[in-house]
Amino acid sequence: MAVKIRLTRMGSKKKPFYRINVADSRAPRDGRFIETVGTYNPLVAENQVTLKEDRVLDWLGKGAQPSDTVRSLLSKAGVMAKFHDQKFSK
């Protein structure tokens, strides 16, 4: 089963709000998911992102592939650097 970390759209029309979910790559965008690991609100001036860093690092360690947008959000939050350090420090 190929697992992806990607955004799921929530909110109302013209007011998007996203959950960062771990899901099977074959599932629909707003469909079935395995776990919610964070949120992203693009409407706030500083683009508010909340993450469960330990769970994100766990899923990345298990081989989950982040989407391009999620990879960008994780990089800005410093999670990808931590994952890289963990992976190559052994």
From Swiss-Prot:
Alphabetical UniProt keywords: Ribonucleoprotein, Ribosomal protein
A Pfam family it matches: Ribosomal_S16
GO biological process, one term: translation
GO cellular component terms, semicolon-separated: cytoplasm; small ribosomal subunit
GO molecular function: structural constituent of ribosome
InterPro entries to which the protein is assigned, alphabetical: Ribosomal_bS16, Ribosomal_bS16_dom_sf
Family the entry assigns: Belongs to the bacterial ribosomal protein bS16 family.
Protein name (database record): Small ribosomal subunit protein bS16
Phylogenetic lineage: Bacteria, Bacillati, Bacillota, Bacilli, Lactobacillales
